[in-house]
Amino acid sequence: MSLLLGTYRLATRVLEPLAPRVLAYRARKGKEDPARINERLGHPGVARPAGALVWMHAISVGESLSLLPVIALLAERRPDLSVLVTTGTLTSARMMAQRLPDGVIHQYAPVDAPGAVSDFLDHWRPSLGLLVESELWPNLILEAEARGIPLMLASARITEHSAEGWRKRPAAARALLEAFACILPQDEASAGRIRALGGRDDGRVNLKLVGAPLPFDRKEFDRLSGAIGDRPVVVLASTHEGEEAALVQRLLTLDPLPFLIVVPRHPERSGTIEADMAALGLTVAVRSRKEVPGADTQVYLSDTLNEMGLFLRLAEVVVLGGAFGPLIGRAPGGGHNPLEPARLARPTLTGPDMSNWSIAGAMAEAGGLKILTDLSRLAPRVAELLANPAQARVLGRQAEQAAAGADGGLEVLWQAMAPLLPPAGGR
């Protein structure tokens, strides 16, 4: 073990007694579920089912949702296996509660401290661990390796910034990456960085490129469609802090103003967004308060979870957030999944920071995504698409075709996973 990892493990052991206090503080700030803090300390909330169990871990909403096709694949090909999913954020836990199939267990991931990790693994005894993207928690990884639990890193992603940090700690990087029995980078850039740091490369898998159109509630669609009437709808999807006010302010130049649906990435920001809209002189209805849009409603604030499929279907134009940071003086967000509106043939505009989505460039080249490098172009582009439904349909079809051609490598994942699973009926 490298000196750095040894120091990290010692430090986390010494500091672990403070974890309950830190978690309680975070719960008071709304960043932890106070009813489930024990899970973060490695103490399970439910009993372990008998037989073999596959453990899957992802940190936040996007990564967590990307596990759903894998879970469906396991249910089809290895129905004898139990599945445990761990996530790290409140939002992802709430989303998983709504989206996980019956029988799949969700728990919060333990904090990366030796005692919590040991208790977690003692209870769940996974036959295989599947981690998504860049979840390199030293205690969790090294303890699983020490117990002989095979680990996979799927959709592995290491940015140049992260790689630069790991290059300064080569022994630690190598030790963590060598703990994985299989690494499936999501793109060539990440693959090259992982190989350079001493990790293996077992093929390309990007789970965020796998998936069906988002689900929706037909009754809610009909109800909202009736409330909105014949007003054109523009959806601001997965917006980040600062984007709502900046984007809506530009759209105020449109006459008439389209009906705006704002779906923030983090619904807990609802109060701030509502205040921002009121400051712009707009009338707002808030979904979490069960308010129905009226004839005078200009902005519908969707501060709920698991309803993106509903709102995308209501849209004539989608403005995809998380990508406008460079244009509004905010930190980079990396963008959000352009395939979600594309699978529904929705014409989509987004900002220049799509660094988390290598497919965005190909979609833009194919005409299925419009990337704005200047916010002054937002209102004219939206106006053009609303005034020319035929052009909007062409853009939507191009987006849909680009989504249909995306291959996330689910079969590659299965071929790599199958040999690591216990035999049917095993433990």
Task: Name each region found by the language model.
Residues M1-R427:
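Nucleotide-activated sugar donor-binding and catalytic core shared by glycosyltransferases
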